């Protein structure tokens, strides 16, 4: 079995934010290394249940053993699916309401550290970046077959890369000679396309482009928006959603969606009281995002960009 070692970020804060009830029904939309799932399960009584989603079979296989004590007790159900299928998958299992939903977004450490998965510019590996290894679209297809305009669009939108046009132009001219096959080739190409002065600041020059391609391959923002909409719909009264984001695009999406659900819209002038059907049906648990402590930042450098937002259904 492939090891799936992963240091869970904001573990206590995220699970405590769910206010777990012993007999509640909970969903971990991002099983990964099982850290959040384990802590939720430890708080459940015999009538409580957890549904843990992951589109990566490696994570499911690892946690069959990692969480074996809870598997044996029948308290956890693993669901191999993209969390954009949240409502459908739960309906198939006879569940139409839940007491809490957790998201720990981004690529887990084992996916980054497994050179063969092609997520990282730190290793030279075939271009892949699929979280679900059964899906057809991969990074090689994006880099070699998508048009110049489509590449510029995703580099700007998902990578917020200032030099999107230069990188896309370099990719276009390079692939005319031969296909771009590996992460190493792509990283070198990006580095050569970005001006030397810009390469000296802001970390590795390939970071933003790799992020953009990964988001495009996995449709991460589309999946998140669809899933959050479903999670809000199936939440029981007093149920909560905890979301950890790791980059500004995700955080802005979550912040916007939570704001829409917790603020009163435009009201008619002179209205003496607010009708019940116009009152918000959700409230924010934390107005500002919760971030890792200094101790956690020292122990886990990958936690530095994490932000936790929590919402509750009234």
Swiss-Prot record:
GO cellular component, one term: cytoplasm
Binding residues annotated for S-adenosyl-L-methionine, in chain numbering: 34-36, 54, 83, 104, 111
Main location: cytoplasm
Gene Ontology molecular function, alphabetical: rRNA (cytosine-N4-)-methyltransferase activity
Alphabetically ordered keywords of this record: Cytoplasm, Methyltransferase, rRNA processing, S-adenosyl-L-methionine, Transferase
GO biological process: rRNA base methylation
InterPro entries: RsmH (IPR002903), SAM-dep_MeTrfase_MraW_recog (IPR023397), SAM-dependent_MTases_sf (IPR029063)
Class of the enzyme per the UniProt entry, highest EC level: transferase
Localization (cell): Cytoplasm
Catalytic activity: cytidine(1402) in 16S rRNA + S-adenosyl-L-methionine = N(4)-methylcytidine(1402) in 16S rRNA + S-adenosyl-L-homocysteine + H(+)
UniProt-listed Enzyme Commission number(s): 2.1.1.199
Family annotation (HAMAP family): 16SrRNA_methyltr_H (MF_01007)
Similarity comment: Belongs to the methyltransferase superfamily. RsmH family.
Record's function text: Specifically methylates the N4 position of cytidine in position 1402 (C1402) of 16S rRNA.
Protein name as annotated: Ribosomal RNA small subunit methyltransferase H
């Amino acid at each position: 079995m492939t090891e799936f070692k992963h240091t869970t970020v904001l573990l206590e804060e995220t699970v405590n934010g769910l206010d777990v009830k012993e007999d509640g029904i909970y969903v971990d939309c991002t099983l990964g290394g099982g850290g959040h799932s384990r802590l939720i399960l430890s708080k459940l009584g015999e009538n409580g249940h957890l549904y843990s989603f992951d589109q990566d079979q490696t994570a499911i296989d690892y946690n069959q053993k990692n969480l074996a004590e809870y598997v044996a007790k029948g308290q956890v159900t693993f669901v191999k699916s993209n969390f954009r299928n949240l409502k459908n998958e739960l309906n198939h299992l006879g569940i139409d309401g839940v007491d809490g939903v957790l998201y720990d977004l981004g690529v887990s450490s084992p996916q980054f550290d497994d050179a063969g998965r092609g997520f990282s510019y730190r290793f030279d590996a075939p271009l892949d970046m699929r979280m679900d290894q059964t899906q057809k679209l991969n990074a090689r297809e994006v880099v070699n077959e998508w048009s110049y305009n489509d590449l510029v669009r995703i580099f700007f939108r998902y990578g917020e890369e200032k030099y999107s046009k230069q990188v896309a132009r370099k990719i276009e001219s390079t692939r005319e000679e031969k296909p771009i096959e590996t992460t190493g080739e792509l990283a070198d190409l990006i580095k050569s396309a970005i001006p030397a002065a810009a390469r000296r600041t802001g970390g590795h020059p390939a970071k933003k482009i790799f992020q953009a391609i990964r988001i495009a391959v996995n449709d991460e923002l589309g999946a998140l928006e669809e899933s959050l909409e479903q999670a809000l719909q199936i939440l029981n009264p007093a149920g909560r959603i905890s979301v950890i984001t790791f980059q500004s695009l995700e955080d802005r999406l979550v912040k916007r969606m939570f704001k829409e659900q917790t603020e009163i819209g435009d009201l008619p002038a002179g209205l003496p009281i607010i009708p019940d059907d116009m009152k918000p049906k959700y409230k924010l648990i934390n107005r500002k995002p919760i971030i890792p402590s200094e101790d956690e930042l020292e122990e886990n450098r990958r936690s530095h960009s994490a932000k936790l937002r929590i919402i509750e259904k009234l």
